[in-house]
Amino acid sequence: FNLVGALTVFSSEYRSRHDAKYIPSAWDNRFVANISGTYDFSRGWSVGAKLSAIGGTPYTPYDVDKSSLVEAWNASGRPYYDYSKYNTGRLDAFAQLDVRVDKVFYFRKCMLGIYVDLQNVTFSKLRQPDVLMSTGVIENPSAPPSEQRYKMKYIRQASGTLVPTLGVTVEF
């Protein structure tokens, strides 16, 4: 049986000018943690697992007011960031559990190993900032063109699925 763990705690910030306040950098997750272990059974079987966790990433929120203006949206086709709030948002932390089962066969001049590896068995979802989108519907069509606004909506972004892998190893 073996068990290994690592924890890294950090802060990554910078200033745009020497007299400015510190701002979190894009990779300021605050922590990264990993714990992994394996257990060897008889007859060439082994089971391993790894738990990984990482703190939330900072992000810059959108300028919803500017983005909803019809003229602004039509000029860029995408939302505008609110750079006065640069990296003030922070996503949730993320963790996932991976599990692997191995079976080894020994022959006179070689070893054959087969394994099943399941990544993210907990189906954890890695969040990204929600995307601000125009619905294409103008909420105030009778307003002057410079004041017309699109109705906006957020699209949630999250990914996370079980990733199975079957493998074969051969050693001579």
Label every PLM stretch briefly.
Residues 16-24, 84-88, 151-155:
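Extracellular loop and loop/strand-boundary signature of outer-membrane beta-barrel proteins
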Residues 10-18, 75-83, 142-149:
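Flexible, solvent-exposed coil segments and beta strand-coil junctions
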Residues 1-61:
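Gram-negative outer-membrane beta-barrel transporters
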Residues 78-84, 89, 134:
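Compositionally biased, intrinsically disordered low-complexity regions enriched
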